[in-house]
């Protein structure tokens, strides 16, 4: 499906437990039109319109939803889909979607889930069959939003979670923050960290004292982003943080 064999073999050697797609700020976009939509990355590659992303270049979305699910199947790993819940990137001047726009995004999520999990007699399952995969791929995780937070996120998160869980109760729901503190259900919280080398070294015990009765933790992104990032010193700082994660997994 268009991916370099040598890179996929290295990925396979890592034996990943799951793959997150697409993840990152491409999910949020920088405008209502650039917010991620499943339908834009479905169907034949040559029919996908692509999108300008917030890093300043155009994504063809040639690696789309089908290719991602096929890669997960080939690697024998679980799939995690990340959807937009009606918010653009909050770091870059957020735009909040209105009611009809939120519903359109929620409908888009259901189309994606049907593509991954529906029978070939369904609308999106039939497209999957025409793309060469008659049987459902399956999907284990759904992450609602990317790096979103605050009351606006919590409201949208709960709307998506409730609707999806009613139809697909088997899906494991991932939140961007600890929404349980606002009284909302979740299975896993996705924590992202970008900081100095020293912060990562000093926080090697970050997870030693987490409440084991709370939600699971998924560190979806972390990196040193301050100072000279191309040094052994930086690598050791990140490694110290990783040791803490491994110790608590």
Q: What residue spans do the PLM features occupy?
A:
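Alpha-helical scaffolding within the catalytic cores
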Residues: 5, 62-68, 116-134, 175-180, ...
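Short, solvent-exposed turn/loop segments enriched in Gly/Ser/Thr/Pro and often Arg
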Residues: 20-31, 83-87, 177-179
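Short, well-ordered coil/turn segments that N-cap beta-strands
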Residues: 15-17, 75-79, 135-140, 169-172, ...
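Conserved, mostly hydrophobic/aromatic
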Residues: 15, 19, 72, 112, ...
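Aromatic- and acidic-residue-enriched carbohydrate-binding clefts of CAZyme catalytic domains
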Residues: 27-65, 92-107, 114, 118-143
């Amino acid at each position: 499906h268009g991916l370099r064999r040598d890179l996929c073999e290295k990925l396979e050697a890592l034996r990943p437990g799951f793959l997150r797609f697409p993840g990152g700020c491409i999910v949020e976009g920088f405008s209502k039109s650039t917010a991620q939509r499943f339908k834009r990355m479905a169907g034949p590659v040559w029919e996908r319109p692509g999108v300008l992303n917030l890093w300043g270049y155009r994504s063809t979305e040639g690696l789309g939803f089908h290719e991602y699910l096929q890669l997960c199947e080939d690697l024998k790993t679980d799939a995690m889909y990340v959807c937009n819940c009606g918010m653009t990137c909050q770091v870059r001047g957020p735009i909040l979607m209105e009611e009809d726009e939120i519903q359109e995004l929620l409908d888009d999520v259901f189309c994606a889930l049907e593509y991954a999990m529906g029978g070939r007699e369904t609308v999106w399952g039939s497209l999957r069959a025409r793309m060469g995969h008659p049987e459902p791929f399956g999907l284990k995780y759904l992450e609602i939003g990317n790096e979103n937070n605050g009351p606006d996120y919590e409201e949208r998160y709960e709307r998506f979670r409730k609707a999806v869980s009613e139809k697909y109760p088997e899906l494991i729901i991932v939140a961007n923050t600890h929404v349980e503190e606002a009284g909302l259900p979740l299975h896993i919280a996705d924590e992202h960290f970008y900081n100095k080398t020293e912060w990562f070294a000093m926080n090697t015990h970050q997870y030693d004292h987490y409440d084991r009765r709370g939600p699971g933790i998924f560190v979806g992104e972390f990196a040193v982003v301050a100072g000279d990032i191309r040094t052994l010193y930086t690598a050791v700082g990140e490694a110290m943080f990783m040791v803490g994660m491994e110790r608590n997994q």
